[in-house]
């Protein structure tokens, strides 16, 4: 793992969290219980404080940063998709930020909301509970349905379960030179499938 103290502030990581060895945590970063931090994520707390609350996930290649005297927060059970950028914003409890979305300074994403992939949420945006946001700039297009929220929660549970799986079975290795016969497939822990 790449942890760096900055001007006397050391990242805080709960012992039940999983931080991938290629992720980088710098300075004023607080990671809660059962959190998953994916490969190549960068949590750069060299200005503002970064807080990832219990059960949330920050997936591969995500960036968190913010200005001085601000907190960038991912609420409990928050779900931050691959490549998303969070800068000085607040992601509400049980919300999802889709892949490669950008959430700017002072923006607040409401609880149980979903930000569609590739969306751009402008600085100062104030979302409400259970909104589906999409576009550039993002706007609320409708409410999140019960089925969509259930789907989001299944995906988040997969990452919460992945924390324990990684603690138990992830290790560095050398590659095989050819694929073995009857190579098994990995299985998730829920029946979640991609949204179509």
UniProtKB/Swiss-Prot annotation:
Gene from which the chain derives: caiE
Lineage, opening ranks: Bacteria, Pseudomonadati, Pseudomonadota, Gammaproteobacteria, Enterobacterales
Keyword match Ribosomal protein: no
GO BP: any one term: carnitine metabolic process
Source domain of life: Bacteria
A single GO molecular function term of this UniProt record: transferase activity
Listed name of the protein: Carnitine operon protein CaiE
Span list, region Disordered: 173-196
Stored Gene3D superfamilies: Hexapeptide repeat proteins
Family: Belongs to the transferase hexapeptide repeat family.
InterPro entries from the UniProt entry: CaiE, Hexapep, Transf_Hexapept/Carb_Anhydrase, Trimer_LpxA-like_sf
Pfam families reported for this sequence: Hexapep (PF00132)
Pathway membership, UniProt: Amine and polyamine metabolism; carnitine metabolism
Keywords carried by this UniProt record: Repeat, Transferase
Function, as annotated: Overproduction of CaiE stimulates the activity of CaiB and CaiD.
């Amino acid at each position: 793992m790449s942890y760096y103290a900055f001007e006397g502030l050391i990242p805080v990581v709960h012992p039940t969290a999983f931080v991938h060895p290629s992720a980088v945590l710098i300075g004023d970063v607080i990671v809660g219980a059962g959190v998953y931090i994916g490969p190549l994520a960068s949590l750069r707390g060299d200005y503002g404080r970064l807080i990832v609350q219990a059960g949330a996930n920050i997936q591969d290649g995500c960036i968190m940063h913010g200005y001085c005297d601000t907190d960038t927060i991912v609420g409990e059970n928050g779900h931050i998709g691959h490549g998303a950028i969070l800068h000085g914003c607040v992601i509400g409890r049980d919300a999802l930020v889709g892949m490669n979305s950008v959430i700017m300074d002072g923006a607040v994403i409401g609880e149980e909301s979903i930000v569609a992939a590739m969306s751009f949420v402008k600085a100062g945006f104030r979302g409400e509970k259970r909104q589906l946001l999409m576009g550039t700039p993002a706007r609320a297009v409708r409410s999140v349905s019960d089925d969509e929220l259930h789907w989001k929660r299944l995906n988040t549970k997969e990452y919460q379960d992945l924390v324990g799986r990684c603690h138990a079975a992830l290790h560095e290795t050398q590659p095989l030179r050819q694929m073995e016969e009857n190579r098994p497939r990995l299985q998730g822990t829920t029946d979640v499938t991609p949204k179509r």
